Amino acid sequence: MKIITCYKCVPDEQDIAVNNADGSLDFSKADAKISQYDLNAIEAACQLKQQAAEAQVTALSVGGKALTNAKGRKDVLSRGPDELIVVIDDQFEQALPQQTASVLAAAAQKAGFDLILCGDGSSDLYAQQVGLLVGEILNIPAVNGVSKIISLTADTLTVERELEDETETLSIPLPAVVAVSTDINSPQIPSMKAILGAAKKPVQVWSAADIGFNAEAAWSEQQVAAPKQRERQRIVIEGDGEEQIAAFAENLRKVI
């Protein structure tokens, strides 16, 4: 059983600065980290490994220079995967969901897999598209919002997901792609033994050419900016008479 767990390196949100002049975001001082939602996918994959005989877990990521960071690689491997594959290319530095999914699908085909796990979305964009797009590209079943994995056999994965007013149980034929929600588990903090052992695990570095990926016309991101902030007027209207109500209504009209 070959399980691939996908993850994304994202900027640490606490280090992102806002340029007051135009509202643009400054990522220059933000360190990269594993997307919080993908930590759940990594944990789920490693829990499945304990259930399936001879299962192997491969962590897979696509991106730019952030994936060259040795500390980041060690962090991923310390959480349980047996090996790591990173696909690094400058064109993937700010990849949007369609391109990311295309590269992940190509890399997964090259590596071989029975099951692909990923988080429902990423901590930065949270587009909630990549998992379903990977399934579409590979022409295999894809399910998102999975909150529980019930069982895994050689050819079927049984899962649950919470809908608005019911719990849905699904049996998914393998191979398949499953995007998990944060309800599925609580990611463990790696032990010192796991951290030290991570340095001995294999890491494969692939380029776009290695997976046969040709640059495609992708949607381009036009702008990422913080919302404009309005200065508060600090208008306080005291009382509940007709004059105060009229004044309140008049001020509402000015901002609507």
UniProtKB/Swiss-Prot annotation:
InterPro entries: ET-Flavoprotein_bsu_CS, ETF_a/b_N, ETF_b, ETF_beta_N, FixA, Rossmann-like_a/b/a_fold. Pathway: Amine and polyamine metabolism; carnitine metabolism. It comes from the Bacteria. Keywords: Electron transport, Transport. The keyword Metal-binding does not apply. The keyword Electron transport applies. GO terms for molecular function: electron transfer activity. Pfam families: ETF (PF01012). Transmembrane segments: none annotated. GO terms for biological process: carnitine metabolic process. Required for anaerobic carnitine reduction. May bring reductant to CaiA. Belongs to the ETF beta-subunit/FixA family. Heterodimer of FixA and FixB. This is Protein FixA. It comes from Escherichia coli O45:K1 (strain S88 / ExPEC). The gene is fixA.
